């Protein structure tokens, strides 16, 4: 027999626990208070670190953000997805590592530091390389923590104890190792090729660092005369007309091309043109590249200053003539290369008027001379895409220069096979096609940049220009048997940032460190998934696959892939579908959505440090209109839930703050539901009510059976959707269950039973158990997306069920499905009850009866099965539908004047008598009737007017006829309703 003292003590302890729980859940949900200090507690407790004691592993490498950058919405979206996956797998029992790190971001970081120095009156070129690098490291130490602080604010559960930086010693060693081995394998070479050249910053750029900006320009049409004055076109002219948006490049033309199928010019193929200005004689060549329909069908070819012309020039073995220096000024002597194998060019003297001119000054002069000399045909306005440097905004020039390249054909084959045979899966699958198309046409990769900040290329030159490649100078001398007195100079260039990023999955796991814990690579490589945007499939994803498969091998010597799945998400755009950019003034900072920001601060943020200050006034006006009160604080969980709810694989998302507001309300709903559950666990005096600690299905009724069935069905769906990377569906599952099923239905049904004196104490104890059990389970399955809110509430709920096996929900077990609880019959019964309740609520709304009025309800045409079902749920039905009396009509019973609704074949009726004031309702309907009657008569008169009908467009007349028919239908229904009211 139980000791009464022990029972009383247990009750007192429970009361204390519940009161403490309520005190931790204040009346109003305040995300800033909930979040404060929580992340630091998680991090300090080591919850984000792997344990190496699990059978299954899950790992993600964080795409490294710019070390000195700030979080943008793309980062926020990406991090929300990765953290949801990481937290899910950690809770689901996997040995989990989310590997963090930052990128040195060569050109971006160097530009920031140069601007800071220029503000102090210091130019980089006036400093030594070593002194400048020291300044960059100072800047990195000063501002490098900003991005990681912001990642923490997002709740991202990365293992900070393993944080890496692409310029760390370990990663730098990996970069050197890879470069040297590729060079020794004959896969890295130095050669002259056409590159994107930034003349302002004087470095080669990757395609990703070039923005094609829509701009208004001109299309100049020039007459290029035949060398042989006896040759003419079909229409008798002794010249061809070519069009260009870059007249200055005419100085470097080496051919004119036509399409071989173009009959207008077939007789001219193989003839020659004498170029204006230079007097150079160039051939007319035939190539399918030329569009017959564009312009005259004749194209000037400048292989050294246009990527398409470069390829055409290679096909026709045309010489390349470089006319520009590194500053985009016209060379005093143009460099002529018969082919790319020729190291030293011959020189062709530039016409004196052009030597040394800046490119646009040369353009102006050339157009003026063309007009004066009679070879300017015409000038047209032209919409073009200007290639501008992403940072700095300079027009980028295709320029012929010596650079370092990776010969990627050999590396590409295993990377193609790995995707073709399914070792690596793209989600969604269509991105496999994008990857394969690029890989099958892959070009050698330019990996050198003319910068000071970055991984300096491990190559040295002697005084004769011979190249030596090794990990350091000492190894160079040893490897190549060079005497100590041989002078060596290290290459000044640094590697493309994407080179070090291409090693990211394995270099961060200490691949190049012989003293590292081998379990890290063995356990977490290949990584499980790469989460990325489609815009860097070529620049990063493909290169990671190639590099990893070349350098990382399994025990049997087969290549190891970097990741098993590539999850590709869309880009975050504004609410109108526009790309977010500083220049458009539509950028949102995730931290401002979390913490809120005043209007003036937001305006200042959007209009300061703009590349085009003239846009500031327009952006300020736009911002004040869009955010008149600034941005309120929504909290991290609402933002994360918004991101995941929009994460439909592969699609761009249009970000709308109204969505965040809606999910902030969802967080509030969970908070309030939790408080309600706790308050229903104590009596009016605040003493604990009985709460069962285990399930007792024998006393469950339909609501308990239903919510437990729905809970387990939801768990099944969530697991399935996580496995499919459908985080939008995971969010939908969570929202639908918690808001629509738990809060709107089960909590309301439970409330009715707990307030019903006829319900036994035994059942009430089970209802409280189910309320708590379902809530605690829902908190756990929601945690990967809403970590802060769920942790705060779980800490108060779990102890009441003795479920604090762990100190934090972060490492609690993820819910698993109990199939024995799922019942299709139970869910069908509940669906019927919901329809029944909804039908009464609809009638209540149509009759404009307040919720306080309890209604008499009649049921007609009820089947035997429905009658049995009704007997089990009558109390719940009456409580939630606010029904005063429930009567089942027999066949032949008189049916009073009622408002009705159908549930299948069952008719639900609410008698009108006594519920409304017939006189007042008739008066109201009469006014409405008169108004509608006037409208219908006006339209009828219009349609009776022959002038209107004959002159108005047919669609206008038809619209008026449809409107009249609709009004007449409303009048007929209103007349019948008024007749019914007269009979009450």
Swiss-Prot record:
Determine if tRNA processing is one of this entry's keywords. no
Q: Which InterPro entries match?
A: aa-tRNA-synth_I_CS (IPR001412), aa-tRNA-synth_Ia (IPR002300), Anticodon_Ia_Val (IPR033705), M/V/L/I-tRNA-synth_anticd-bd (IPR013155), Rossmann-like_a/b/a_fold (IPR014729), tRNA-bd_arm (IPR010978), tRNAsynth_Ia_anticodon-bd (IPR009080), Val-tRNA_synth_C_sf (IPR037118)
Question: What main location does UniProt list?
Answer: cytoplasm
* Gene Ontology biological-process annotations: valyl-tRNA aminoacylation
Q: What is its EC number?
A: 6.1.1.9
Residues annotated as binding ATP are: 582
Q: Which GO terms describe its molecular function?
A: aminoacyl-tRNA deacylase activity; ATP binding; valine-tRNA ligase activity
Q: Any S-S bridges, and between which cysteines?
A: none
Q: Does the keyword ATP-binding apply?
A: yes
Q: Where in the cell is it found?
A: Cytoplasm
Extract the Gene3D superfamilies matched here: HUPs (3.40.50.620), Isoleucyl-tRNA Synthetase, Domain 1 (1.10.730.10), Valyl-tRNA synthetase, C-terminal domain (1.10.287.380), Valyl/Leucyl/Isoleucyl-tRNA synthetase, editing domain (3.90.740.10)
Q: Which Pfam families match?
A: Anticodon_1 (PF08264), tRNA-synt_1 (PF00133), Val_tRNA-synt_C (PF10458)
Keywords for this protein: Aminoacyl-tRNA synthetase, ATP-binding, Coiled coil, Cytoplasm, Ligase, Nucleotide-binding, Protein biosynthesis
Catalytic activity annotated for this protein? tRNA(Val) + L-valine + ATP = L-valyl-tRNA(Val) + AMP + diphosphate
Question: SUPFAM superfamilies, alphabetically?
Answer: Anticodon-binding domain of a subclass of class I aminoacyl-tRNA synthetases, Nucleotidylyl transferase, tRNA-binding arm, ValRS/IleRS/LeuRS editing domain
Where does this protein have coiled-coil stretches? 954-984
Q: Which GO terms describe its cellular component?
A: cytosol
How would you summarize the oligomeric state and partners of this protein? Monomer.
- PANTHER family assigned: VALINE--TRNA LIGASE, CHLOROPLASTIC_MITOCHONDRIAL 2, VALYL-TRNA SYNTHETASES
Biological function: Catalyzes the attachment of valine to tRNA(Val). As ValRS can inadvertently accommodate and process structurally similar amino acids such as threonine, to avoid such errors, it has a 'posttransfer' editing activity that hydrolyzes mischarged Thr-tRNA(Val) in a tRNA-dependent manner.
Q: What is known of its domains?
A: ValRS has two distinct active sites: one for aminoacylation and one for editing. The misactivated threonine is translocated from the active site to the editing site. The C-terminal coiled-coil domain is crucial for aminoacylation activity.
HAMAP family on file: Val_tRNA_synth_type1
Record protein name field: Valine--tRNA ligase
Q: What is the lineage of its organism?
A: Bacteria, Pseudomonadati, Pseudomonadota, Gammaproteobacteria, Moraxellales
């Amino acid at each position: 027999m139980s000791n009464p003292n022990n029972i009383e003590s247990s009750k007192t302890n429970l009361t204390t626990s519940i009161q403490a729980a309520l005190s931790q859940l204040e009346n109003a949900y305040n995300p800033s208070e909930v979040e404060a200090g929580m992340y630091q507690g998680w991090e300090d407790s080591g919850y984000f670190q792997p344990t190496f004691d699990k059978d299954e592993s899950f790992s993600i490498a964080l795409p490294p953000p710019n070390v000195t950058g700030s979080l943008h919405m793309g980062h926020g979206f990406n991090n929300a997805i990765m953290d949801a996956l990481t937290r899910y797998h950690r809770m689901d029992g996997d040995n989990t590592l989310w590997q963090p790190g930052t990128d040195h971001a060569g050109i971006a970081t160097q530009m920031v530091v140069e601007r800071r120095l220029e503000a102090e009156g210091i130019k980089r070129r006036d400093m030594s390389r070593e002194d400048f690098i020291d300044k960059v490291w100072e800047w990195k130490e000063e501002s490098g923590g900003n991005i990681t602080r912001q990642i923490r604010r997002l709740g991202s559960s990365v293992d900070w104890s393993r944080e890496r930086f692409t310029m760390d010693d370990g990663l730098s060693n990996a970069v050197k190792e890879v470069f040297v081995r590729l060079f020794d394998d004959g896969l890295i070479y130095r050669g002259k090729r056409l590159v994107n050249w930034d003349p302002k910053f004087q470095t080669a750029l990757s395609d990703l660092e070039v923005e094609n900006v829509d701009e208004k320009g001109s299309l100049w049409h020039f007459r290029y005369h035949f060398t042989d004055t006896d040759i003419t076109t079909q229409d008798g002219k002794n010249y061809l007309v070519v069009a260009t948006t870059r007249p200055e490049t005419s100085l470097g033309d080496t051919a004119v091309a036509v399409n071989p199928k173009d009959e207008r010019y077939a007789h001219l193929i193989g003839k020659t043109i004498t170029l204006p200005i230079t007097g150079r004689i160039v051939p007319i060549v035939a190539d399918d590249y030329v569009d017959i329909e564009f312009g005259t069908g004749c194209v000037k070819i400048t292989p050294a200053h246009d990527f398409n012309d470069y390829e055409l020039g290679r096909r026709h073995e045309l010489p390349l003539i470089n006319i520009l220096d590194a500053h985009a000024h016209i060379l005093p002597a143009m460099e002529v290369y018969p082919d790319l194998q020729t190291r030293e060019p011959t020189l062709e003297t530039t016409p004196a008027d052009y030597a040394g001119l800046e490119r646009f000054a040369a353009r102006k002069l050339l157009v003026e001379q063309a007009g004066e000399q009679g070879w300017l045909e015409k000038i047209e306005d032209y919409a073009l895409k200007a290639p501008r440097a992403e940072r700095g905004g300079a027009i980028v020039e295709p320029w012929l220069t010596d650079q370092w390249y990776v010969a990627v054909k050999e590396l590409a084959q295993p990377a193609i096979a790995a995707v073709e045979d399914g070792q690596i899966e793209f989600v969604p699958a269509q991105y496999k096609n994008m990857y394969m198309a690029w890989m099958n046409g892959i070009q050698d990769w330019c990996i050198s940049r003319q910068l000071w900040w970055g991984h300096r290329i491990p190559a040295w030159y002697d005084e004769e220009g011979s190249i030596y490649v090794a990990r350091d100078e000492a190894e160079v001398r040893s490897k190549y048997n060079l005497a100590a007195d041989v002078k060596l100079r290290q290459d000044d260039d640094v590697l493309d940032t994407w080179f070090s990023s291409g090693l990211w999955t394995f270099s961060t796991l200490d691949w190049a460190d012989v003293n590292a814990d081998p379990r890290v690579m063995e356990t977490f490589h290949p990584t499980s998934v790469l989460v990325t945007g489609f815009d860097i499939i070529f620049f990063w994803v493909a290169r990671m696959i190639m590099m990893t498969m070349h350098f990382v091998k399994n025990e049997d010597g087969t290549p190891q892939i970097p990741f098993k799945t590539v999850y590709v998400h869309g880009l975050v755009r504004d609410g109108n579908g526009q790309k977010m950019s500083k220049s458009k003034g539509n950028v949102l900072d995730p931290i401002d959505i979390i913490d809120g920001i005043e209007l003036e601060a937001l305006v200042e943020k959007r209009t300061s440090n703009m590349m085009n200050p003239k846009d500031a006034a327009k952006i300020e006006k736009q911002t004040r209109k869009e955010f008149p009160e600034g941005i309120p604080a929504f909290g991290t969980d609402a933002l994360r839930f918004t991101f995941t709810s929009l994460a439909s694989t592969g699609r761009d998302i249009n970000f709308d703050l109204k969505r965040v507001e809606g999910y902030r309300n969802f967080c509030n709903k969970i908070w309030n539901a939790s408080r309600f559950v706790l308050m229903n666990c104590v009596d009016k005096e605040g003493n604990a009510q009985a709460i069962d600690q285990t399930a007792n299905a024998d006393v469950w009724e339909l609501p308990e059976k239903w919510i437990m069935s729905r809970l387990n069905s939801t768990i099944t769906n969530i697991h399935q959707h996580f496995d499919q990377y459908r985080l939008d569906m995971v969010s939908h599952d969570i929202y639908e269950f918690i808001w629509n099923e738990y809060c709107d239905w089960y909590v309301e049904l439970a409330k009715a039973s707990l307030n019903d004196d006829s319900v036994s104490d035994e059942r009430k104890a089970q209802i409280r158990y189910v309320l708590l059990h379902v809530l605690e389970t829902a908190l756990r399955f929601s945690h990967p997306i809403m970590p802060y809110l769920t942790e705060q509430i779980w800490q108060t709920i779990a102890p009441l069920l003795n479920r604090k096996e762990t100190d934090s929900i972060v490492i609690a077990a993820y819910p698993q499905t109990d199939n024995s609880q799922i019942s299709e019959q139970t869910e069908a019964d509940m669906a019927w009850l919901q329809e029944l309740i909804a039908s009464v609520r609809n009638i209540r709304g149509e009759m404009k009866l307040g919720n306080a009025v309890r209604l008499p309800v009649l049921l007609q045409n009820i089947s035997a099965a429905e009658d049995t079902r009704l007997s089990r749920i009558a109390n719940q039905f009456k409580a939630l539908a606010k029904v005063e009396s429930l009567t089942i009509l027999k066949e032949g019973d008189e049916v009073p004047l009622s408002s009705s609704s159908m549930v299948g074949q069952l008719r639900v009726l609410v008698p009108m008598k006594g519920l409304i004031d017939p006189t007042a309702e008739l008066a109201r309907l009469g006014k409405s009737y008169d108004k509608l009657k006037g409208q219908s008569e006006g339209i009828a008169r219009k349609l009776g007017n022959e002038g209107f009908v004959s002159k108005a467009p047919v669609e206008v007349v038809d619209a008026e006829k449809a409107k009249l028919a609709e009004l007449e239908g409303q009048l007929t229904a209103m007349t019948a309703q008024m007749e019914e009211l007269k009979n009450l």
